[in-house]
Amino acid sequence: MDSRRLQLQHATDLAEEQKGGVLVITEGVFGMKGDLGKLDEIVALKKDFQFRLLVDDAHGFGTMGEGGRGTASHFGVTDGVDVLFNTFAKSMAGIGAFVCGPRWLVNLLRYNMRSQLYAKSLPMPMVMGALKRLELIRNHPEYQQKLWEIVRALQNGLKENGFEIGVTNSPVTPVFMKGGIPEATNLIVDLRENHGIFCSIVIYPVIPKGELILRVIPTADHTL
C-alpha cells in the first residue's frame, strides 16, 4: 500500500504540473500467474487522491465475484471502478470485447477509437452467441459454483503432489517448472498424447531462461 501511495503522489504531482489527470490501470486477474489485482486497496486510495481507475478484467469476468460479475465484485468495490474492460474470448469462449463506463466515455470511444472506427462489426452469429452465454452466466450460478469446485480440487491436488503453483487466487493455475524449449515440447506432447490433457506452456522470452510455466485453466465442463 505504501508503494502505491508514493506512486500515486508522484503521478498526482506530475499531473498538476502538466495540468492533466491521473489514470490508474491494472488487471483484475493477472493472466500469467492467476493472482488478483489489489482493487480494494487501490479504490481505498481514492479517499486521498483524485484519479480514475481502469480495470482489465479479461480473466475475472464470468469466473470471479457474485454471478461472475468480475474481480471488482469479488472485492466489493464495483462502484469504485471508472472504466471496465472485458473480453468475450475467455469465460464466454467467443470473440470480441467490450468497455463499460460512463455514457460520455463510451460515446467518446465509440466515435474516436481507431480500433473501433476502422474495424468491422462482430458477425451476428457471434453477437447472438455472446448474448446467450451472458444469459447462461446470469441465470445459472451453478456453473460458476461447479467451476470453483474443480478449481479447488485441481489446485489442492497439484500442491499435495509437490507442484509449485504460486499464489493464484483464480481459475488460472500456473505450474512452475524448470527447463527449456526441448523440455517444454516433450511435456506438452506427452500430456496431450498420453494423458488427454491440452494446455499451453510459457517459455523464454516471456519468462526468464530456464523456467517454464505450464498454464492450466479448468472449466465448468471438466469432471472431477
PLM segments and residue spans:
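Active-site phosphate-binding strand-loop segment of PLP-dependent enzymes
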Residues: D2-L54, T219
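Short, small-residue-enriched loops and turns at beta-alpha junctions
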Residues: R5-L6, V29-K33, G60-T63, Q116-L117, ...
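Short beta-strand
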Residues: V22, F85, A119-K120, E164-N169
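Conserved active-site segment immediately N-terminal to the catalytic lysine
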Residues: Q50, G70-F88, N107-Y111
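Conserved core segment of the aminotransferase class I/II
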Residues: V83-F85, M92-Q144
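Conserved PLP-binding catalytic core of the aspartate aminotransferase-like
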Residues: H140, Q144-Q155, K159-H195, Y204-E211, ...
